[in-house]
């Protein structure tokens, strides 16, 4: 049913055409996720236009890529920063980002001739400096970084399976169990890790999840960088993550918000890959 023009609000009016940003969804990418993002039913009130939902996603991808503050979102995003922030928070509560990652990851693997669900994965962590306004933090004594540590689990092609953010003073072996708990891919049966995941706690967490934990110990470097077997894949994923300015520092007041932006970065990456047909080689 159409809404009378006299009572239309910005939610019911189609967004004004604007110049496109590099982070914007293509028409093909939007058609791929539209049915997952746009609600099929409403609990009252007037339904929001599908074009408005696309604006919300574009706004979130823009913030993730450029690192701009919420209130600095360009005004030509007619959805507005407040509405975009509300949907960011809502998707954290409903788990929509995890669902999008799973669906897009399975499609990417299938198109590359692999099984939809991986059976092996690689784990790693990286420490990120936190801004003064950020929330929980700690000091990574080894890297001399005051901030947070993000622990990620990726498949053998580098696609994100799970992320867990902690204060930087939390050891990798202590966070491994929580990271596995956030992994929704039950088919993973083997995980490669570095020496920071040795000890009783990681072994018990892996055994509880039915996973074979393999510690990769590379040769002592004779000079220069030595690539460790298997583990170089997760290092490449860390490089992809750092292409997004919102993630090179911790700006968020909660650790869950940082996890949310990290998942958004990988959702945008998967959509671009599926558009271009470049499934595993490049951005």
Residue locations for each model-derived region?
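Short alpha-helical elements
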Residues: 1-283
């Amino acid at each position: 049913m159409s809404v009378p023009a006299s009572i239309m609000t910005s939610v019911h009016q189609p967004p004004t055409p604007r110049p496109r940003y590099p982070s914007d969804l293509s028409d093909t990418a939007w058609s791929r996720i539209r049915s997952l993002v746009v609600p099929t039913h409403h609990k009252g009130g007037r339904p929001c236009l599908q074009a408005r939902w696309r604006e919300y996603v574009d706004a979130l991808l823009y913030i993730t890529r450029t690192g701009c503050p919420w209130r600095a979102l360009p005004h030509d995003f007619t959805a507005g920063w407040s509405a975009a922030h509300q949907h960011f928070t809502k998707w954290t509560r409903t788990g929509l980002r995890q669902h999008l990652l799973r669906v897009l990851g399975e499609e990417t693997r299938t198109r590359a001739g692999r099984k939809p669900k991986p059976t092996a994965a690689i784990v790693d962590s990286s420490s990120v400096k936190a801004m003064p306004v950020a929330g929980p933090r700690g000091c990574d004594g080894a890297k001399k970084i005051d901030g947070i540590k993000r622990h990620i689990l990726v498949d053998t092609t580098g696609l994100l399976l799970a992320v867990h953010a902690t204060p930087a003073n939390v050891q990798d072996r202590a966070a491994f169990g929580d990271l596995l708990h956030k992994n929704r891919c039950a088919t993973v049966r083997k995980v490669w890790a570095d020496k920071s995941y040795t000890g009783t706690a990681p072994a018990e967490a892996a055994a509880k999840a039915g996973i074979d934990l393999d510690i990769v110990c590379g040769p002592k470097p004779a000079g220069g960088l030595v690539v460790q077997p298997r583990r170089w894949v997760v290092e490449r994923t860390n490089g992809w993550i750092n292409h997004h300015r919102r993630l090179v520092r911790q700006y968020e007041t909660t650790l869950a918000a940082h996890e949310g932006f990290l998942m958004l970065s990988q959702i945008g990456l998967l959509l671009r890959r599926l558009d271009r047909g470049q499934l595993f080689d490049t951005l």
